[in-house]
Every structure is written in C-alpha cells, then in structure tokens.
C-alpha cells in the first residue's frame, strides 16, 4: 500500500519494509501547453551528501552526464528529453545496503535545462512527483505529489532519503530555487563553472 506524503512529512522506509534494500526512485512531471517558445527539458539529478549536508567530491553528483555514484549504489536511468507520456520520466536505482557509510542523505532534484535562456520556470510545470518503488516487487511504497505553488523557480529539491538510527527514511521536501542546478550544486559544496 502506497503512503502518500505532503510537503514536510517524513516516513520510515526500511523500518516499515524489513529486508528492503533495492529501490527505484521515480520522478515525473508534465509541462503546461502554451503557444510558441521552446520545448521543455526537465532533468533529475541526485546529490550524495555527508553529515554536513555537502558532497565530498564531484563523484557524489549523479546526473545525465554522470549516471553512477556511491561506488555503484546509485544509478541514474539517463535523460528523458521530452517528459512525454505517463509514469516516471526519469528514475534512479538505489541499493540502500551498498550506499557508502559516509553518505548520510541522498537528495533528489528536478531542474529545467536552460531555464533562464528559454524563459521557463516551474510555474509552467504540473503534476510533478517523486515516488519510491521496491525494485524487486515493483510495489510503490511512497509517493509525494508536489503542490503546484511554484512560479519563478527553475529547480526543486523534491525529496531526500536519509539515514536515521541505522534505518533509511524519506522526507518530502518540495523546496523551489531560482538559479537552477548550479545554485543547488553550489549549496551542496560543489564548484560550478
């Protein structure tokens, strides 16, 4: 049975699902139809964070140009250029039992590629979600539908998996940012540019 979360809610993942080690984190979205302009290219990215909330190295940033991190414990499906169709637009496989011990938190981000140049923002995006699926059974465990209260933001931290007392939990974040992926990467301690 799927647990639906609202912004700010946290839920146990491994404690309530004993033996769970491999999950798929699916991210999805729709773009609002409007005349003219450029096509949207939304991207999901993953940041592997230490206890200080920072990436220890550029290898802790997983995205369409670096599909794997955490010694192979986190694998990105690759870039979906259109976001068309039903279901997940992009997904990330996480082997929770293999995530390196120095990683305390795994942050899942959705950004709009070239948002500023294309005059695009999350006010033009709807039905964004993040969900967690048991990779072995394909059962949806957790779903967080992001509210559509974004306007000028070009990046969203959708949610985070984090360690707590030896277990993994999920937090529905839903925080929007201006400045796109570069702003979030900088906040997470990476050099950009």
UniProtKB/Swiss-Prot annotation:
Disulfide bonds: none annotated. PANTHER family: CAMP-BINDING PROTEIN 1-RELATED (PTHR32097), GENERAL STRESS PROTEIN 16U (PTHR32097:SF4). This is General stress protein 16U. InterPro entries: Stress/Tellurium_Resist (IPR051324), TerD (IPR003325). Pfam families: TerD. Keywords: Stress response. Belongs to the CAPAB/TerDEXZ family. Induction: By heat shock, salt stress, oxidative stress, glucose limitation and oxygen limitation.
